[in-house]
């Protein structure tokens, strides 16, 4: 077969249909007409001489050949993106793109500060921040869609061998109360006092809520006895609800610095209990790393790491993250080790 039987655009269309589940939604996501999408798929099936979709059901289902082409197609598209970014790097940070991933709390309260510092130094580098669940973010790093990420949740077990996972910072979680709550007059409260509060929480599947449950359990506090007033879907909504007097909540201290300074929320320590979780820096050591990612990792990341881990982060990043195209493609035959 001398000529390739497909184009990059056709691979993008195939991927969009697989993700969206229908030709129409795929067309909408690609900003093209549905007939154009259908025609490209028909041409692709004719060129390959195999059906790629089972059109019998309500949802467009890939055939075995469709799954096979999608698997290779995603790798081809990813490699094309890496190639473009490697060429951009020839401009020596006078352009290019840095793509950073984050889970909800780190993406809302930590990464914007880091990106702001980076942009001041490298204003010509475009920066994208992708904020999703820990699981989705980890997969994005593994697939090469994101250069690196800082997350607070549990990384999927199937990815632990393919990712470099570095303990990056400690995130302290605090109990916040309305400023007019009686407990604000006390220097600390006791564990038993928690059972008297009405709590506002994230949903039961959220990472932070699971961490809080685990840490409190180690301190012999049974969160199953907590009175849950309401469940909300964002930290900002929880802060506003507490500020309005609807209940108490546990949130990251990074999320309440402004409110504490303004005096609109109160942080009350629990006697003998400190709630901390580890934030993780993750990246794929087998993927090409742009100069923008190297600069961000070496110049910005160490400034926000927990002091005890600062040097470890810097050493690991310098050792692991500086990977160029030749390193990724050609085995090292030198004697440098």
UniProtKB/Swiss-Prot annotation:
Q: Locate the DNA-binding region by residue range.
A: 23-42
Which InterPro entries does the entry link to? Answer: LysR_subst-bd (IPR005119), Tscrpt_reg_HTH_LysR (IPR000847), WH-like_DNA-bd_sf (IPR036388), WH_DNA-bd_sf (IPR036390)
**SUPFAM superfamilies linked:** Periplasmic binding protein-like II, Winged helix' DNA-binding domain
Q: Give the Gene3D superfamilies listed for this entry.
A: 3.40.190.290, Winged helix-like DNA-binding domain superfamily/Winged helix DNA-binding domain
Record function comment: Trans-acting transcriptional regulator of RuBisCO genes (rbcL and rbcS) expression.
Family in the record: Belongs to the LysR transcriptional regulatory family.
Protein name, entry field? Probable RuBisCO transcriptional regulator
């Amino acid at each position: 077969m001398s000529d390739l039987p497909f184009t990059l655009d056709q691979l993008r269309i195939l991927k969009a249909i697989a993700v969206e589940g229908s030709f129409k939604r795929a067309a909408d996501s690609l900003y093209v007409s549905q007939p154009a999408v259908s025609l490209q798929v028909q041409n692709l099936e004719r060129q390959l001489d195999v059906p790629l979709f089972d059109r019998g059901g309500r949802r467009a289902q890939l055939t075995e050949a469709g799954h096979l082409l999608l698997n290779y197609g995603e790798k081809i598209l990813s490699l094309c993106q890496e190639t473009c970014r490697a060429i951009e790097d020839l401009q020596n940070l006078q352009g290019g793109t840095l793509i950073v991933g984050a889970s909800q709390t780190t993406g809302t309260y930590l990464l914007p500060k880091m990106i702001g510092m980076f942009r001041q130094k490298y204003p010509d580098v475009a920066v994208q921040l992708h904020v999703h669940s820990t699981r989705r973010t980890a997969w994005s790093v593994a697939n090469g869609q994101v250069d690196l990420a800082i997350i607070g949740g549990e990384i999927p077990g199937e990815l632990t061998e393919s990712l470099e996972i570095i303990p990056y910072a400690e995130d302290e979680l605090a109990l916040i109360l309305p400023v007019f709550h009686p407990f604000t007059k006390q220097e600390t409260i006791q564990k038993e006092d928690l059972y008297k509060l009405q709590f506002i929480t994230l949903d039961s599947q959220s990472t932070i809520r699971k961490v809080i449950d685990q840490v409190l359990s180690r301190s012999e506090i049974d969160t199953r006895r907590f009175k849950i007033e309401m469940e909300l879907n964002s930290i900002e909504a929880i802060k506003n609800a507490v500020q309005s007097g609807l209940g108490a909540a546990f949130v990251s201290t990074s999320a309440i610095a402004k409110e504490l300074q303004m005096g609109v929320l109160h942080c009350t320590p629990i006697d003998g209990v400190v709630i901390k979780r580890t934030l993780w820096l993750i990246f794929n050591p087998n993927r090409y790393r742009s100069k923008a990612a190297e600069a961000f990792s070496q110049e910005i990341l160490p400034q926000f790491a927990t002091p005890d881990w600062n040097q470890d982060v810097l050493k690991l990043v310098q050792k692991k993250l500086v990977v160029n195209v030749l390193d990724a493609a050609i085995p090292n035959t030198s004697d440098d080790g």
